Amino acid sequence: MTAIDVSVFAQSQDPDFTPALVGKPWDPKRNAMVFDAMGEIRDSFTDELIEEILASGLRAISVTCGNPRQQNQSVEQNYQSALEEMLWFDNYIEEKPQYYIKATSTADIDRARKEGKIAIFYLTQNSEHFMHDLDNVNAFYGVGQRTCQLTYNYQNMAGSGCMERHGSGITDFGGLLIEKLNDIGMMIDVSHANVRTALDAIEISKQPIQISHTTCDALFSSPRGMPDAVFRSLADNGGVVGITQMRLYITLERYGAVDLYFDHLMHAINVAGIEHVGIGSDRDHRRLVVTPEYLEEMQQEQGERFDISKVPLYFEELNSPRRMEVIWDKLLERGLSEDDVEKVTGLNFCRHYNNLIG
């Protein structure tokens, strides 16, 4: 990897930096519901970090299994990648029973809240791992998958992603897949889909669907954002939209722009309604420092898609395992009641999961 001057990221260099917005410690007596509908858990997390994440109130998270970048893989590779990662998470959770619970229903969230642990749900950010065989939906359900994102960034057999130049909507196979997912009780996610695919899926599905991690195209134009029409249609059909914490889909400003993130949350609430908005961070919960090692990690993960101009990917004020406390306090400042804040931080997605998977 070519050497990169990291001094341009000076605000991210102090590993002991504490975001100024982090206020009082989370009150465990409040026991508010905190659910990250699309986040990351890594084996590099130390016990100390996990305990800090727990102290922030997080009690449920959905994690991506497999490599969703299907254009670089065969469907067989997608199948193997998704299966191997689900089995890896099985082992990882078993090795840390003091912190984690493998989750397949909201009863596992209830248990996590009672025991002070994190319930981990499995999702895929693509449907290619089914290898165009609907019987494989049953197989992955049996392993523990509870959410399927229909597409990633490009065209697949189900529909079209947001980066496809001449994309379709839901395909004939995609319609059959939606029907199968409805029947078996696996949730449908249209994050990364193009607008037509998202609207088609909402119309075809007999069950509410979700957009676990997106932004508001009305505030900042990005391929990963969704227009208000999608939010309204989703809400009208009982779904939930999660707003991502990925800065590059919200602003080009590297620092000092965290209020724009809360603008997106409030806009989604105003359009879809307070019952239909949640959090899907699309990030892990580490405190990140931009170093050559971190940049190399990003380059390995993203390959040719890696763009140094987009670093840092996060808002510095949310760059902490205590970020959910920041979100709680800032939404109160925006005028929401504590009851409504809890809907956004977790209850809405918890209700959605309960309605669809029990």
PLM regions and their residue ranges:
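Divalent metal-binding pocket/active-site signature
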Residues: 128-131, 140-225
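N-terminal hydrophobic targeting/anchoring segments and the immediately downstream early-domain regions
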Residues: 2-166, 221-358
